[in-house]
């Protein structure tokens, strides 16, 4: 299943490759949180509908509600898809998580957390929401990729 999901992710990222925008454009907004070198290796695509791998096997494993959830963004490796520009900070946390855990590590952990805790209580999501809240509320600047490595 992991290989099927990763193949779908790679195909999805390939299909949007021409529309990808480099996140380095956010360096001044996110300075102190995300190093320029990290942002230069992260991309986003603004889409009308968030792409998800709607495989019957995922539904059989209990991911139906996650698949049907109206998400504002989702991250696949170094690229995230957003329906709103507001979600960049949150999705960049997930880019850092993917980079640290690797494709299989992230997919396995994310699936396990969704099944065990549900979306809103999953540790990877809670980390992203907490860091996003810190940024939105003008909190202390934190090097996000380093924070992810230390706290994941």
Task: Name these PLM-found stretches.
Residues 17-74, 78, 130:
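Auxiliary, metal-adjacent structural segments of Zn-dependent hydrolase domains
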Residues 22, 26, 85, 120, ...:
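Hydrophobic (often cysteine-bearing) scaffold residues that line and stabilize catalytic clefts
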Residues 34, 100, 132-135, 139:
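Sec/Tat-exported extracytoplasmic proteins
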Residues 69, 98-130, 146:
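Post-HEXXH active-site segment of zinc metalloproteases
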Residues 2-16:
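A short, surface-exposed helix-loop junction/capping segment
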Residues 86, 90-98:
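Active-site recognition of the HExxH zinc-binding catalytic motif
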Residues 138-152:
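Long, well-structured alpha-helical subdomains associated
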